[in-house]
Design a protein with these regions (language model features):
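Short, conserved charged micro-motifs
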Residues: 45-47, 85-90, 166-168
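Active-site loop/lid in soluble adenylation, ligation, and acyl-transfer enzymes
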Residues: 1-50, 54, 58-62, 133, ...
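Short acidic-glycine loop/turn motifs at beta-strand connectors
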Residues: 31, 72, 134-137, 148-149, ...
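Internal, conserved structured core segments that host functional sites
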Residues: 73-129
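Residues forming anionic-ligand binding surfaces in small-molecule and nucleic-acid pockets
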Residues: 63-81, 169-175
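Aromatic/basic-lined ligand-recognition segments
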Residues: 127-133, 137-145
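Long, positively charged amphipathic alpha-helical accessory segments at protein N-termini or as interdomain linkers
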Residues: 96-118, 146-214
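Short beta-strand-to-loop capping motifs
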Residues: 39, 79-83, 134, 160
C-alpha cells in the first residue's frame, strides 16, 4: 500500500506538470487491514504499535492531512485537480457529487458540522464540513487534502462495512454499522464512476482520467 500513496503523489505531480491533465480520479481497495496516518500526526498510541507488532494491522503514512483511517472493507478514492479553489469550496464540489451519487442509490448523506479543532486520533471520530454523515448520524465518508503548486490531492474513505472488533481495538469506539445498501463495493464504485462522468459539467470538472483498478 506504500505504492498506492506513491501513485497518488505521482498523479498530483502529473496534474501539476502536464497541461493536458485537469483532473484524475482513482478508486481502490486495500489488501489486508491497514491504518493510514495523516501527514501531520506526530505520534501514534502505544496500543497501535502493539497491534502492528502482533501483525493485526499494517500502518502507512498518507501525504494528505487529517486523522488516522482504518482501511478494511471500504472504498478509497484519490482525486487530483488543477485548480486553486478555496479549500472549503473544493471539498464542497466533491461532496456534492458524492451526496448526489449516494442519494441515487438510496443513501442520504449530509455535511458534518463539528468545529475544527486539534487533529483527533481517529478521523471518523469527528465530522467536519469536509466529511459526510448518514441519516443516522454515522460518518460515512472522511476526506483530507494535500495542496501543492496550484493543485490538490484529495483522499477519501467510504466506510461501507468496517470490522467492528478491530475498530474498537484501535479507537476504543464503536464502528459505524454496515451501510444499508444491497450493493457490493464494486457496484458502488461503478455507480460513482458513471455518476461523476455524467455530472462533470455541473461540478466544473473536465478532461477527466479515471482509473478504478484495485
Amino acid at each position: 500500500m506504500y505504492k498506492r500513496q506513491a501513485l497518488d503523489l505521482n498523479s498530483l505531480d502529473q496534474t501539476i506538470s502536464n497541461p493536458e491533465i485537469i483532473l484524475t480520479l482513482r478508486f481502490y481497495y486495500w489488501t489486508g487491514d491497514w491504518l493510514s496516518i495523516g501527514y501531520h500526526q506526530k505520534e501514534i498510541p502505544l496500543h497501535w504499535e502493539n497491534l502492528l507488532s502482533n501483525g493485526e494491522i499494517n500502518i502507512v503514512r498518507r501525504p494528505s492531512g487529517g486523522g488516522a483511517v482504518l482501511h478494511s472493507g471500504g472504498i478509497t478514492y484519490a482525486l487530483t485537480f488543477k485548480k486553486t479553489y478555496y479549500k472549503v469550496l473544493s471539498y464542497e464540489m466533491v461532496n456534492n457529487w458524492l451526496i448526489k451519487s449516494f442519494r441515487e442509490l438510496g443513501l442520504n448523506l449530509r455535511y458534518g458540522n463539528s468545529r475544527k479543532s486539534s487533529i483527533k486520533t481517529n478521523c471518523f471520530g469527528t465530522s467536519l464540513i469536509s466529511d459526510l454523515v448518514d441519516q443516522d448520524g454515522f460518518k460515512r465518508i472522511g476526506s483530507a487534502q494535500l495542496r501543492k503548486k496550484g493543485a490538490f490531492l484529495q483522499h477519501g474513505e467510504i466506510q461501507t462495512n468496517p470490522p467492528r472488533d478491530l475498530w474498537f481495538k484501535l479507537f476504543k469506539e464503536e464502528a459505524p454499522p454496515k451501510v444499508n445498501l444491497k450493493l457490493t463495493n464494486d457496484e458502488i464504485v461503478q455507480h460513482l464512476r458513471n455518476s461523476f462522468l455524467k455530472n462533470k459539467s455541473n461540478i466544473n470538472f473536465k478532461n477527466i482520467a479515471i482509473d478504478n483498478k484495485k
